[in-house]
């Protein structure tokens, strides 16, 4: 299959591109480089041993998207593109709604014009909001607490409405929305990984930059939660397991018309301090940290129930916490080397 990956040089998309190519598919990457760098496509090519097609473009450019879909004879789309920082979304809601919601509408308009009706959407556990029970399954109420989560939920609602329509000559939409939890780690090559610009928003990149000496210490937001060690618990999933989940969803699409939602997570939560200790073991470096006050809106625990993905996609996570941390550390060391060359 020919697969268009929007946001194709981003963190999760770049790892998915490798999994898809190695499974025999052909990927086309489409990105405006707001959250990534053009050289990621070159690193993907280095891992694969052959070049990949990478196109610069904005999701709101419907005409260009249509041309890309048609000229590359795209069979299915995996939609990763979008702004993604929770805190930033509260400060810049107009930019988030424009890039994320308008961008998705533009994509679906282009897909309709090009008669491409298979879509995997990159959603988020942020749509659930504060957990009302654990583990969180797909039937959990969706009450997002920030503009980013509301973006994702609105897009899902839009996709569900579109999935109830028919395309040209009665074609049926086949759409899967993957709600994933906290992706971490990197490809085993050390050539690609999570590469945040500025201060990292996510725990592991922050810890990695403390370990490498780029940041002095980690701030742990609260140690008085009702958890085993008092720090927040989250479901961390290796990015390569997540990438394989997208491949499984792609294979699920042809036999399943309509709109389907699935969680992708490990089903196990780790606390902030457990992650710090695991990273210390993986890196051999001591991680300096300071406990500070809780952040407004933070929750004690959040982890997934992914039984639906196991039953319908025949997918489950394979990689351990140690592998998550070891690969993230290898990538951080590689980043330091690449930036000095």
Per-region residue spans from a language model:
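Conserved alpha-helical elements of sugar-nucleotide-dependent glycosyltransferases
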Residues: 12, 203, 271
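Glycine-rich, flexible loop segments associated with nucleotide phosphate handling
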Residues: 54, 171-175, 197-203, 231-236, ...
């Amino acid at each position: 299959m020919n697969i268009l990956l929007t946001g194709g040089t981003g963190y999760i998309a770049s790892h998915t591109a490798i999994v898809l190519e190695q499974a025999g598919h052909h990927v086309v990457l489409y990105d405006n480089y707001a959250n990534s760098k053009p050289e990621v496509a070159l690193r993907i090519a280095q891992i694969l041993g052959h070049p990949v097609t990478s196109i610069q473009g904005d999701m709101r450019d419907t005409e260009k998207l249509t041309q890309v879909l048609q000229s590359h004879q795209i069979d299915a789309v995996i939609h990763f593109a979008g702004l993604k920082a929770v805190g930033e979304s509260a400060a810049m809601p107009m930019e988030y709604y424009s890039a994320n919601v308008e961008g998705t509408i533009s994509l679906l308009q282009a897909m309709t014009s090009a008669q491409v009706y298979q879509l995997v959407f990159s959603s988020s556990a942020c749509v659930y909001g504060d957990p009302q029970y654990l583990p969180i399954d797909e039937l959990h109420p969706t009450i997002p607490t920030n503009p980013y989560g509301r973006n994702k939920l609105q897009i899902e609602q839009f996709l569900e409405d579109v999935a109830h329509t028919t395309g040209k000559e009665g074609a049926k939409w086949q759409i899967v929305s993957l709600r994933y939890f906290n992706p971490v780690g990197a490809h085993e090559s050390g050539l690609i990984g999570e590469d945040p610009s500025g201060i990292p928003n996510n725990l592991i990149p922050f810890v990695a930059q403390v370990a490498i000496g780029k940041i002095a210490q980690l701030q742990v937001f609260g140690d008085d939660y009702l958890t085993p060690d008092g720090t927040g618990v989250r479901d961390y999933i290796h990015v390569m397991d997540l990438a394989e989940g997208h491949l499984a969803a792609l294979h699920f699409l042809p036999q399943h018309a309509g709109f389907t939602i699935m969680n992708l997570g490990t089903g196990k939560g780790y606390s902030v301090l457990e992650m710090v200790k695991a990273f210390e073991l993986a890196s051999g470096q001591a991680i300096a940290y300071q406990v500070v006050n809780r952040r407004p809106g933070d929750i004690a625990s959040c982890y997934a129930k992914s039984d639906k993905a196991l039953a319908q996609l025949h997918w489950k996570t394979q990689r351990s916490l140690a592998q998550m941390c070891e690969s993230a550390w290898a990538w951080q060391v590689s980043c330091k080397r690449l930036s000095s060359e």
